[in-house]
Design a protein with these regions (language model features):
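Hydrophobic alpha-helical segments
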Residues: 2-263
Length: 263
């Protein structure tokens, strides 16, 4: 595998990074609900908030995938064009799930209206992509703007459901690592995936494109360090967290490190 990866172009390596990001975000998030809330240490409202945020993060991840597929399609990649409609359909379902969760758990009216507004943005963007009214860079920019908006809704959920104000340091740090920092890292990696897909489809990587990818690489390194720092803080005074998180965190660090070293 290594020899194959070494033969890949810079753009292809960044696409692999983006795919890796979608796998790795699951590890802290999956452990999060089980670890943070065992023994009913947290208020029920916080548990509900974590469930809502999990659904929002799912929409963000699907949006990141759709951004990459769209960039490839608009750049002329027929294979990615064939995969895109299924991802668009999954995204529509994801928006539905969040809508239901917000209603079910009585989220703040402002959060509900923000979500409805962003769903309209998504519908308009998807139609423009499907009819190929956009160039790949513009599609990537609009997807990224929408994803930024979804992050802000997630931040509102953190505050509204009391997840931002946990008095326990260990669960607060785990909340930040699993529900915020890991998603920031996947977003930087997802942006690289979209750019990589675009350059691959175009069959060229101009100097300014290489500079953009290298700048993105620096952001990934910083975001990865940020995530690991918060995981270490969560582990510091909690043996249960340490037992369950240290191994996966180390494996994640090594995997990302190896992939970055190839670029």
């Amino acid at each position: 595998t290594m020899s194959l990866l070494h033969r890949l172009s810079l753009a292809q390596k960044f696409m692999i990074l983006g795919l890796l990001a979608l796998v790795m975000v699951a590890f802290p998030a999956a452990l999060y609900l089980r670890l943070a809330f065992q023994g009913a240490a947290q208020a029920e409202r916080q548990v509900e908030g974590a469930q809502v945020l999990g659904e929002i993060n799912g929409v963000i991840q699907s949006s990141q995938k759709h951004r990459g597929l769209s960039a490839g399609m608009l750049g002329g990649n027929v294979q990615l064009e064939q995969k895109r409609p299924a991802m668009a359909s999954a995204l529509a379902q994801g928006y539905d799930k969040v809508e239901r969760a917000l209603a079910s758990f009585h989220a703040a009216p402002q959060t509900v209206s923000q979500w409805a507004e962003h769903r309209k943005e998504w519908t308009a963007l998807e139609q423009r992509v499907a009819s190929k009214q956009l160039q790949a860079p513009e599609s990537t920019r609009l997807h990224t703007e929408l994803i930024d908006h979804l992050f802000l809704v997630g931040e509102g959920v953190l505050d509204g459901f009391g997840l931002s104000f946990d008095p326990r340091v260990d669960t607060h740090m785990l909340t930040q690592a699993a529900l915020v920092k890991s998603m920031v890292l996947t977003e930087h990696m997802g942006q690289m995936r979209a750019r990589g897909a675009m350059y691959l489809a175009q069959g060229t990587l101009p100097p300014e494109g290489r500079a953009t990818l290298q700048a993105g690489l620096r952001q990934i390194v910083l975001a990865q360090a940020d995530l690991q720092r918060y995981l270490a803080k969560a582990n510091a005074d909690n043996a249960a967290f340490r037992k369950d998180l240290e191994g996966p965190a180390r494996a994640l660090d090594e995997q990302v490190g190896k992939t970055l070293a190839m670029t």
